[in-house]
């Protein structure tokens, strides 16, 4: 989560915690704190406190994404080397807000204000097997190439969450139904 924990976040945490307990799994707490406008210490502390007060104990040491920037940059480099990502010069007013992160991050990939985008494949239908909704298919042509590294060298949620899911060997994601009705297929499948 990011920002204030709201009832939808509590519901999703509860469902995730219950699912993990029922299936002898693990409930992980990961704080997406790459967006500093919504990632203050007050927000982080309130999320952790609220989940603890509700008895939703996590099974891991809390993962703070801001502490893994170097690892994310390594993954972006791998994607660039495999031609699965590319540099893109964007206008300043596009969704590449500047951030005032009070931490040191690795900006070795910056090329004169370029962002780095993930290169989506466009040939094969994207099929997802959802435990609630069944099989969901997406036409890859409606997906845009998402920014995975901002021009200031800060990785985006689109990258960090996928890398962490792989590293943490996440097998199930529990998301709100809003993502299935979103006009953006990226939101529905992320």
Protein language model features and the residues they cover:
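N-terminal catalytic cores of NTP/NDP-binding nucleotidyl/phosphoryl-transfer enzymes
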Residues: 1-48, 143-179
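Short, intrinsically disordered low-complexity segments
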Residues: 10, 29, 96, 107, ...
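Secondary-structure boundary/capping residues
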Residues: 25, 56-59, 188-190
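A very general structural signal that marks isolated residues within well-ordered alpha-helical segments
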Residues: 22, 124, 171, 187-188
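Single conserved hydrophobic/aromatic residue that forms the stacking wall/gate
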Residues: 180-190
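Active-site neighborhoods of enzyme catalytic cores
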Residues: 40-150
């Amino acid at each position: 989560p990011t920002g204030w924990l709201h009832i939808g976040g509590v519901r999703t945490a509860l469902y995730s915690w219950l699912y993990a307990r029922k299936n002898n799994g693990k409930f992980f707490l990961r704080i997406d704190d790459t967006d500093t406008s919504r990632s203050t210490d007050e927000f982080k502390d309130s999320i952790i406190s609220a989940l603890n007060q509700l008895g939703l104990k996590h099974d891991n040491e809390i993962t703070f994404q801001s502490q893994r920037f170097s690892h994310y940059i390594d993954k972006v480099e791998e994607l660039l080397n495999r031609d699965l990502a590319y540099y893109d010069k964007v206008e300043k007013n596009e969704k590449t807000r500047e951030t005032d992160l009070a931490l040191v991050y690795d900006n070795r990939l910056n090329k004169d204000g370029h962002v780095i985008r993930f290169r989506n494949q466009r040939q094969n239908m994207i099929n997802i097997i959802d435990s609630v909704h069944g099989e969901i298919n997406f036409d890859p042509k409606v997906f845009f190439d998402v920014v995975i590294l901002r021009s200031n060298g800060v990785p985006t949620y689109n990258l960090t969450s996928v890398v962490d899911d792989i590293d943490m060997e996440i097998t199930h994601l529990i998301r709100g139904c809003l993502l299935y009705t979103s006009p953006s297929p990226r939101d529905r499948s992320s």
